[in-house]
Each structure stands twice: as structure tokens, then as C-alpha cells.
């Protein structure tokens, strides 16, 4: 006959520990935190740091933050990760080199900037992504060369505008798009040469209206459509003969609006 569960219930997620063993009444009685249960401070299947289910572990440490420091070296990575979320900051540095990235993710969210710098080269991309979101701008520049495109894209979102032109040559489209949305003149002209129409559309949206002549002949019709939405009258006249009906309609609409505006001005 198997041992009875400590809570006597049969929930959708059973109360088992990280090694797959049921959390029985006997296990609860032998637990180092048995006194907490006697006072209603924990409950198997709901709030228990011995459980394999992360949400139950988190409930335990939310109620007993002072105990988090004592479980940062637990054998189960979820316990270490959740304890790191609640532990005192000065206990976290050893976990910067924890073997599990889930733990290091939590550490990257909390350690001060002087320590975060050392995590820029973490072997796991998700950790570096967290670091890139938090790290001081002076230390972020080195992450613009990260092997992962998402880290570089975050750098393109956060770095000072003056540091963005080199990211316009990035091999990943998402990085170039982030840089294209923020870069200023004269680097803005370079967007016209990008191989991706998505970037050239941004050029058509951001370049001065007087500088759209080249893009009016872009091979991608969506770029020409953007041009037709902003160009001055002389360029619009040429776009009335575009091979794509959407571009012609956009150019004709703009010219009608311009003509109506002139009529209103002159009565």
C-alpha cells in the first residue's frame, strides 16, 4: 500500500518532489520546515519548497523570504532559481556561474551593474538578453557584436544614436530594422541601399520628402507606395504611371488633396 499524500488530495498536479517521489505525511514530518506547516506556513500541493512545481516553490518563498538565503545551493535548479528571486543581494554572486541558465536568468535580473558586466558573455542567449536589457549603456556597446541577433537588436534599441550606423550593416534583418528606426542623418541615406524592402520602406518613411527620388524607382512596390504617401507633387506625377495600381492610386489621392488645398487657399 502506497504512502498517503500529505494533503490527502488528488489534484491535477500531484505533490511530488524534484526526484519524482510523492510528498507524504512522513516526508512532511521529517522536513526541516515541519514547524511551519504546524502554524499554517506551508501546505503540500500548494506552498512547498520540496515540491517539483515551480509555482508552489514560489508561494513558499514569497511567504518566507528570510529562508531563501539558506536554499541557494539546493540540488534542484528551480529551488535555486526561485530562492535567488527572493534572497539578499549579497548572497547572489556565487550563482552568477550556476550550471543552470534558469538560475542565472534570475541573477541577471537582480545583481548590481558592477557585477552584471561580468555576465555579458554568459553561454546562454536568454541570460545575455536579460543582461542587454539591464546593463548600463557604457557597457552595452560590446554586446552589439553578440553572436545572437536578439541581443544585438536590444543593443540597437538602447544604444545612443551615434553608435547605431555600424549596426546598419548587421547580417540580421531585425537588427537593421531597429537601427533604421532610430538612426539619424547622414547615416539615414544608407537605408536606401539595404537589400531588404522592409528597411527601404523605413527609408521612404523617414528621409526628407525632397530626397525620395531614388526610392520612387525602387524595385519593391511597397517602397514606392510609401514614397507616394510623402513625395512632393513633381515626383507624384511620375508615380501616376507606376505599374502597380496601389501606387498609382496613392499618388493620385495625394495630388487630389494637394489640388484641393490650393483651391481652398485661393478661394
Residue map of PLM features:
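N-terminal alpha-helical scaffold/docking segments in eukaryotic complex subunits
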Residues: 1-93, 97-101, 221, 225-267
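Short coil turns that connect the paired helices of HEAT/ARM alpha-solenoid repeats
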Residues: 70-78, 97-102, 121-126, 145-150, ...
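Aromatic-anchored, glycine/proline-accented short structural segments
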Residues: 155-193
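Conserved beta-strand positions that form and line the central face of beta-propeller blades
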Residues: 190, 214, 238
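Structural detector for tandem alpha-solenoid helical repeats, activating at a conserved register
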Residues: 78, 90-91, 102, 106, ...
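Alpha-helix capping and inter-helical loop/turn segments
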Residues: 57-66, 85-91, 110-115, 134-139, ...
Amino acid at each position: 500500500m502506497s504512502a498517503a499524500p500529505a494533503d490527502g488530495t488528488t489534484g491535477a498536479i500531484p505533490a511530488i518532489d524534484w526526484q519524482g517521489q510523492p510528498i507524504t505525511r512522513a516526508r512532511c514530518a521529517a522536513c526541516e520546515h515541519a514547524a511551519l506547516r504546524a502554524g499554517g506556513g506551508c501546505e503540500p500541493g500548494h506552498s512547498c519548497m520540496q515540491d517539483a512545481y515551480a509555482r508552489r516553490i514560489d508561494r513558499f518563498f514569497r511567504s518566507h523570504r528570510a529562508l531563501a538565503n539558506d536554499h541557494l545551493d539546493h540540488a534542484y535548479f528551480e529551488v535555486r532559481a526561485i530562492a535567488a528571486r527572493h534572497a539578499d543581494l549579497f548572497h547572489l554572486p556565487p550563482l552568477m556561474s550556476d550550471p543552470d541558465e534558469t538560475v542565472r536568468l534570475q541573477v541577471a535580473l537582480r545583481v548590481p551593474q558592477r557585477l552584471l558586466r561580468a555576465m555579458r558573455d554568459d553561454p546562454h542567449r536568454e541570460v545575455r538578453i536579460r543582461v542587454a536589457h539591464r546593463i548600463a549603456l557604457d557597457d552595452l556597446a560590446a554586446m552589439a557584436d553578440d553572436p545572437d541577433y536578439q541581443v544585438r537588436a536590444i543593443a540597437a534599441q538602447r544604444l545612443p544614436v551615434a553608435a547605431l550606423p555600424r549596426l546598419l550593416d548587421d547580417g540580421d534583418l531585425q537588427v537593421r530594422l531597429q537601427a533604421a528606426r532610430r538612426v539619424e542623418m547622414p547615416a539615414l541615406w544608407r537605408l536606401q541601399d539595404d537589400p531588404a524592402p522592409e528597411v527601404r520602406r523605413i527609408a521612404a518613411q523617414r528621409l526628407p520628402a525632397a530626397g525620395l527620388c531614388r526610392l520612387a524607382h525602387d524595385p519593391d512596390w511597397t517602397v514606392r507606395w510609401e514614397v507616394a504617401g510623402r513625395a512632393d507633387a513633381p515626383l507624384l506625377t511620375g508615380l501616376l504611371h507606376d505599374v502597380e495600381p496601389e501606387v498609382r492610386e496613392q499618388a493620385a489621392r495625394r495630388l487630389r488633396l494637394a489640388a484641393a488645398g490650393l483651391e481652398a487657399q485661393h478661394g
